[in-house]
């Protein structure tokens, strides 16, 4: 259902609504049968709510990782409850549907060049108040566009204690939006609610780590291939 709803780039399309609702319905069964506790939560941000999945060790005061999905992923994509590398290592994991992703997309919460990190801070605020979380040990993991958003969160919020990302997408977005499959640009323009390509290009030009990377103070691990965008 997640893959089926993905290529429908139309707001309020009945097929997209149906398929996304079936995704959520199926994941309720995942929550029911998971070998550890998972909660679906709503975190307030800017007068709206960001839906997340909170995978918990069942212990108090545990280190916690914020998992940032890639551009075309949702919070249901990862981790796999049958083999959750975070839980197996004693860490909680919170996965969010950030602006433009999953439930946020359905709610028309649009990504801009800088609002994902604002949402990230709201998530950290919420985590810091939970008894299951050691607020001094909140890290970030992300893949592809999630690597960029994750790094921006770490640059924006000093409460992040460590960050590990893969398939890096930190620099100018020329490679992903102009040289890769046209689907990437088509997808992000839909997520952002922008029809004008020039307007979108102007926004995308600000989506780099320039002037932001130097603000990151936490230990950072990046896995990058030679041709990653």
Name every feature range the model reports, one short phrase each.
Residues 110-136, 152:
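Alpha/beta-hydrolase active-site loop
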Residues 71-84:
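The serine-hydrolase catalytic nucleophile loop
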Residues 197-229:
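Serine-hydrolase catalytic core
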Residues 86-103:
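Conserved alpha/beta-hydrolase
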């Amino acid at each position: 259902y997640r893959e089926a709803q993905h290529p429908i780039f139309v707001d309020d399309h009945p097929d997209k609504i149906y398929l996304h609702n079936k995704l959520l319905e199926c994941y309720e069964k995942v929550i029911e049968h998971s070998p550890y506790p998972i909660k679906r939560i709503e975190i307030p941000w800017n007068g709206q709510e960001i839906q997340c999945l909170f995978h918990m060790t069942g212990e108090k005061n545990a280190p916690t990782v914020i998992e940032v999905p890639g551009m075309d992923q949702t919070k249901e994509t990862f981790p796999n409850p049958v083999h959750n590398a975070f839980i197996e290592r004693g860490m909680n994991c919170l996965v969010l549907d950030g602006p433009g992703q999953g439930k946020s997309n359905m709610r028309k919460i649009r990504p801009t060049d800088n609002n994902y990190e604002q949402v990230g801070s709201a998530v950290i605020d919420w985590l810091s108040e939970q008894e299951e979380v050691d607020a001094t040990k909140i890290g970030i993991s992300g893949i592809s566009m999630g690597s960029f958003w994750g790094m921006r969160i770490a640059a924006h919020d000093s409460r992040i204690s460590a960050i590990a990302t893969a398939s890096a997408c930190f620099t100018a977005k020329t490679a992903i939006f102009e040289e890769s499959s046209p689907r990437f640009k088509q997808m992000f323009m839909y997520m952002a609610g922008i029809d004008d390509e020039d307007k979108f290009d102007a926004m995308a030009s600000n989506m780099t780590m320039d002037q932001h990377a130097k603000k990151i103070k936490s230990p950072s691990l990046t896995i990058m291939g030679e041709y990653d965008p």
